[in-house]
């Protein structure tokens, strides 16, 4: 798919990986809707991108809110042929800690936002994509999900986060097969240590130390590098049903 023909919805688009992906696509001529929490900076971010971008507020776990946001996105973009799922949350909790067993509601919340929220957006975006005019080889859409290296190398305290991201990896191939007959591709990116809002609260020395754990390049990943890979997935029609690690060859240790 040519980037100039992209009509995209990006969840979590107000910051981090989502915002960087929006910037990459808009620079190539795409029209983009940023789907993020109503309390996010989405409105200001969309305005900063100019008329090619719009903010469509929604909670990714709500069918009603996502349906309304997608309808607004389709109206703004003139259709929908790309979905990039970047919305997500993280929490640290040991299965059994000093205060007792992990709180089930915390585990459930992470699964609800990261895994169920991703699938909710996929299932509701697919009907819009199916209405798109087919391009080369009948392609109608591309869906890109965001997992994490925690899906493979979960650390102590990451049971909920790793489970949610592992679920995204697990659904990638079957959803790609489900949607293949409609001409819709599905891939997942599993980032390593990236300079995103999830790490923003750390002191600079701690961020530098984390970056040095990466074999090469020995630094935190840049959101623009995620955006570049997302753009390459959109352009390369043979990328389908695959999870790509974007991690500088890091393999996380237990802690």
Model region roles, listed by residue range:
Residues 90-108, 127, 131-137, 157-160, ...:
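Conserved mid-core segment of classical short-chain dehydrogenase/reductases
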Residues 222-246, 251:
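C-terminal substrate-recognition "lid" of short-chain dehydrogenase/reductases
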Residues 148:
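Residue(s) in the substrate-gating loop at a strand-loop-helix junction
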Residues 180, 185, 239-242:
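Short, small/polar-rich loop/turn modules that mediate ligand/substrate recognition or access, typified
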Residues 3-33:
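Canonical Rossmann dinucleotide-binding motif of NAD(H)/NADP(H)-dependent dehydrogenases/reductases
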Residues 89, 100-120, 144, 168:
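Catalytic Tyr-X3-Lys loop
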Residues 122, 164, 172:
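Active-site helix of classical SDR
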Residues 127, 176-178:
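Alpha-helical segment proximal to the catalytic Tyr-Lys
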